[in-house]
Amino acid sequence: MGVVQEIRCSHCGAPISFQPGEIIATCKYCGYTVVVETGQTFTFEHSMLLNKYDPTQVEELVRDWMREGFLKPPDLARKAKITEKTLIYLPFWVVSAKAESSYKGIFERITPAIVKEGKIAKEYDWLILARKATEFPAREYEVPLEGKIPFDFRKVEAFAKVLNSEIDKNDAVGLAKQQIEEIHRYLAQQDIDKIIEMKTEMEMSQVVYLHAPIWFVKYEYKGKIYQLLIDGATGAAIKGDIPSGGFGII
């Protein structure tokens, strides 16, 4: 962890703390969002999702998750000890885009092989975690965009952590394009065996900077520590470790 640094909020004058590498920061006193390098106002939409669960309710969600499914040990909910419940508002860029790919390739699953052409057209609200080192299963997180509101620091719980962005808008859009192209290439390879040529065109409709409430839960079971991620906006389990004796991670 680097040394915490500060700039002054140009709106209220309060100190805004940030870590080295963070490029967008939000004042915890007035909710003003600034670009760290310049101290200037952040000009893009800054939204948030509301957390709907307190620590006691989160524990109930965790116990319910432990009881579900045949992969988990039958005594997990009864014997597991929840050791940590941390609410973190993670920063994301949500890139809304239409993507259309045209491809041509060789289909070798029949004899003789034939040349096939096809198209893939999809719409996405593509999620880019705005942190470089934080591990989070973004592809498994169904962000409930219908619940987003303008960022309001008064809605953030006193015990919660709010992480700032380490990735700017242009980098996020570039990553989204790259990842969508990779997904479309994968989908094309379900239809053909060798790609001869492929072209993807994208139309971006909006890019939103969003803070989402994620509960990072740790629990102990038979002497080992496991982690579960809970969506604070919906109560859904995003991803959780299952103790050995089950069959892995879901």
Stretch-by-stretch model annotation:
Residues 4-6, 24:
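Residues immediately within or flanking Cys/His clusters that coordinate Zn2+
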Residues 9-12, 27-30:
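Short cysteine-rich clusters marking metal-coordination/redox-active sites
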Residues 11, 20, 221-223:
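A generic beta-sheet turn/junction motif
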Residues 16, 34:
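Cys/His-rich microdomains that often coordinate metals
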Residues 17, 23-25, 62-63, 67:
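Long, acidic/polar, low-complexity amphipathic helices and coiled-coil-like
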Residues 19-22, 37-41:
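Short Cys/His-rich "knuckle" micro-motifs
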Residues 43-225, 237, 242-250:
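Charged, low-complexity helical/coil segments in non-catalytic cytosolic or luminal regions
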Residues 230-232:
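A charge-rich, low-complexity, intrinsically flexible signal that marks solvent-exposed coils, linkers
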